[in-house]
């Protein structure tokens, strides 16, 4: 049996930098190896017509979005998924992201049929134990082509967010 960790290969379509065609924004705990691995898994299986950008919850942009949507990004207790002017969290964010998966992986979005208290309970259980679910040496994502440090006015228009959230990159 091979003891080497499996490698998640990123699609060559992700090689270009994130442009204004963003149609979703995934905020996650960038310090969590399980979260980083999960984001890589998602991006490797995302449909070609889906353009989700990624950002860490505890970055200046994550904090600004937290203030706007009324959540504390330092909690890091849940992913957030922004699209069409709305902020989704927990299992709702997860099934909405699953709708963007390619091929039969998209069937995971059917989890929305499970009663929300049950699916959120499972989501939170995994979240409490996530530190044991991935090796701590998983590479960071800050340099990934889908990572953004700021929202442009074009991003805000595509995501249906107020233009006031657009701003300069942090110094």
Report each predicted region and the residues it spans.
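Long C-terminal interaction/binding lobes of large macromolecular proteins
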Residues: 2, 48, 73
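N-terminal leader/targeting and pre-domain segments
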Residues: 2-12
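Local sequence-structure signature of Cys/Sec-based thiol-disulfide redox active-site neighborhoods
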Residues: 13-48
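Active-site-adjacent beta-strand anchor residues
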Residues: 28, 55, 112
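Thiol-based oxidoreductase modules, predominantly thioredoxin-like and allied folds used
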Residues: 49-63
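Thiol/selenol-based redox catalytic cores and closely related redox-interacting motifs
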Residues: 60-171
């Amino acid at each position: 049996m091979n003891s080497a960790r499996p490698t998640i290969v990123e699609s060559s379509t992700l090689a270009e930098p994130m442009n204004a065609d963003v149609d979703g924004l995934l905020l996650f705990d960038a310090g969590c190896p399980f979260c980083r691995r999960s984001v890589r898994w998602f991006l490797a299986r995302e449909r070609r017509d889906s353009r989700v950008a990624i950002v860490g919850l505890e970055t200046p942009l994550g904090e600004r979005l937290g203030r706007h949507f009324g959540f504390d990004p330092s909690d890091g207790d849940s992913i957030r998924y922004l699209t069409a002017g709305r902020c989704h969290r927990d299992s709702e964010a997860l099934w909405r992201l699953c709708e963007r998966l390619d091929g039969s992986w998209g069937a995971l979005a059917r989890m929305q049929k499970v009663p929300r208290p049950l699916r959120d309970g499972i989501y939170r259980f995994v979240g409490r134990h996530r530190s044991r679910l991935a090796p701590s040496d998983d590479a960071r994502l800050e340099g990934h082509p889908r990572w953004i440090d700021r929202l442009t006015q074009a991003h805000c228009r595509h995501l249906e967010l107020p233009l006031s959230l657009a701003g300069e990159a942090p110094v």
